[in-house]
Each structure stands twice: as structure tokens, then as C-alpha cells.
């Protein structure tokens, strides 16, 4: 029987989602816990890969358990298909604090967490002053940033384009075309600021409001290339600092298929395209923040 699972995880202890030899990953952690509880090997398929250190909120995966009578689920007298609430409770009891299961439910045998996903959302957090309460999940850059220019550049991402300039080199995907449906920067107020009335010392004359000292970038698309979001954020920060124009950013967003990524023998060209964009930002401030079906 097939089950879907909704979970969140802190990516800092893991070398990404996907199982890899000699490294602890979220997928392996889940498979180990499920195998312990069901008494049989369990393979977990996720909605997509996240890189080392990247976090997730609302991540979706699926797994199969043997038919009735073939296993003792959790050693609690449940044979075959386990009760979702019981299995969810037991999973949270043995999973590390860095992983939490929000829900678990039976799905059809043809449900696929990766291939059935129509949209994936990512959020990247940024702050501009020293703050120990957001440091772990946000990137601190105390630069003067032109958010109007950054949002004008971000709006150019919308639509179906070839994002080869933002793809990590050395990947083996057949196409670098993605359809982006949402991309923008916005301010937010952290919990400790909102609830405790905390505010840093009075800002210098003409400084921006405190709300714009904490901001995030949100992007949604049907699919993402490896390292794509981090490369986009790094390049948008160059726009915000005035080191790259909005027009130059626009030149990195290619018409669908222009990079020739659908054909063989283009690795060298794709590598040279990546060098045109900015540096990737660190992964600790990136969240896979939702999956739609």
C-alpha cells in the first residue's frame, strides 16, 4: 500500500535529501525509521532533491509498505497497512529533532511525489543587521540594496525560459527549461521582533524601516534546476548592489531551448553559460517551502 507523507526538516545536519554513500541524508534517515517501524525495507521517494544544508517546510514524499499479513507494523499488533496516525506518531518519536512528520495518509498506487507535483516553491531569507536569532536560517549581508531594481529583475523570471545560466555545472538533466509563476522580494518581521517589541538602536537618519532589514525572496516554478535558486538570488543581489544592471540580468534569461540543452554534447556550452551569472549564495538560508499537486 502506498502512503504520502508531509514533513519538514532542518537541513543543517544533512548532506541534502537524496541517499548518498558515506553521508547522512534526509531520505536515508526516513527510510531507516520507516524500516524500523514496519519491519521491512522501505524506499522513500521525495518531491525533489535539496542540496546540502537546504531546509524544507511542507515537503512531500511517498513510500510503499507490504500488503496485509506480510509485516508487523511497529510491533504494536498492526499487520499490513499501518494506521496513519499511529505510524506518524511513532515516526516522530524516533526521528531526530531535525525532522518532523506533519501528516501521513494512504494514496493511490499511481501517486508519485515527484512526477505528480505541478509546482514547487522556494524561499530564501536575508537580513541586513547582526541578529543571533535569525542567523542560522538567514543570510546576513549589510549592503545597501536597491529592492526596486531587484524586483524588476525578478519579474523577468516569470514565464517559460531556459535557465541554463543558473544551473550548476556538471549536471545531466535533459532540458534546462522551466516555467516560473512567481518571483519577488518582500520584507518580513521576525517573530522575536513582532512578539517582544525588540528593535535595534535607532537607525541613522534616512535609513530604511526595520521591516526592510529582514527580507525574503520567493520563487515558484514547475521544476527547478540544481542550484538554480541560489544562483538566481546571488545574481539578484548583484543587481541590488548596482554591480549588474537589470538589462544584464535579463540577458541571462534565455528563450526556451536557446541554450541547446535538449541535445547531447552541450556540457561545455552550459558550463560557459553558468559563468555569466553571479555566485551562488549559501544553502542554509534556503527553504523548499511548498509543493503543489
Give the location of each predicted region.
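Structured-RNA-binding interfaces characteristic of tRNA pseudouridine synthases
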Residues: 1-293
